[in-house]
Amino acid sequence: MIDYEKIKKAVIMIIEAIGEDPNREGLKETPDRIARMYEEIFSGIRETPEKHLSKVFKVNNDDVVVEKDIQFYSMCEHHFLPFFGKVHIAYIPNGKVVGLSKLARTTEVFSKRPQLQERLTSQIADSLMEYLKCKGAMVIIEAEHLCMSMRGVKKWGSKTTTIVTRGEFQKDNSLKQDVLNILRL
């Protein structure tokens, strides 16, 4: 559970620090709105992927499973500005698969917290290896970072791509290339 009062006090201090009046009509309810928003967008802090990856289904083959274009958003831990984009997940089952929605939910567990894209990519892949005991995992994230668009270098529309491979995807370049071809990356 988050500390609403502490967040509200901090937001009031920020409003005052930038030279605004926290009692101005448009800002009166802002501290409460931000506290409620933070509970939602940082809900992954209180979750683990285990609850999403523990329900599995037996399969008789170990063909690659690819779930692409999972939309996500997260908050850059350096500037507390959003980054957002698409996650593509591939894994090689080891006799069991997980429901496809569980891959999106696992993405949310890790994206709904202050985050780095590089860490997010690794956490998703590592959780698949740990909980599914799959033969290999590959996660690709393409994201736009508002800390690159709104401030500093101000390069709107630039995207960052991170790729993490585990297991068989690290050992067999043709498997990795097959997934990239499916995704057309």
From Swiss-Prot:
Upper taxonomic lineage: Bacteria, Bacillati, Bacillota, Clostridia, Eubacteriales
Assigned EC number: 3.5.4.16
NCBIfam families in the cross-refs: folE, PRK09347.1-2, PRK09347.1-3
GO biological process: one-carbon metabolic process; tetrahydrobiopterin biosynthetic process; tetrahydrofolate biosynthetic process
Complexes and interactors: Toroid-shaped homodecamer, composed of two pentamers of five dimers.
UniProt GO MF annotations: GTP binding; GTP cyclohydrolase I activity; zinc ion binding
Record: residues binding Zn(2+): 76, 79, 147
Swiss-Prot/TrEMBL keywords: GTP-binding, Hydrolase, Metal-binding, Nucleotide-binding, One-carbon metabolism, Zinc
InterPro entries in UniProt: GTP-CH-I_C/QueF, GTP-CH-I_N, GTP_CycHdrlase_I, GTP_CycHdrlase_I_CS, GTP_CycHdrlase_I_dom
Gene that produces this protein: folE
Major enzyme class: hydrolase
Family of this protein: Belongs to the GTP cyclohydrolase I family.
GO cellular component: cytoplasm
Catalytic activity of the protein: GTP + H2O = 7,8-dihydroneopterin 3'-triphosphate + formate + H(+)
Keyword set includes Zinc-finger: no
Pathway given in the UniProt record: Cofactor biosynthesis; 7,8-dihydroneopterin triphosphate biosynthesis; 7,8-dihydroneopterin triphosphate from GTP: step 1/1
Name recorded for this polypeptide: GTP cyclohydrolase 1
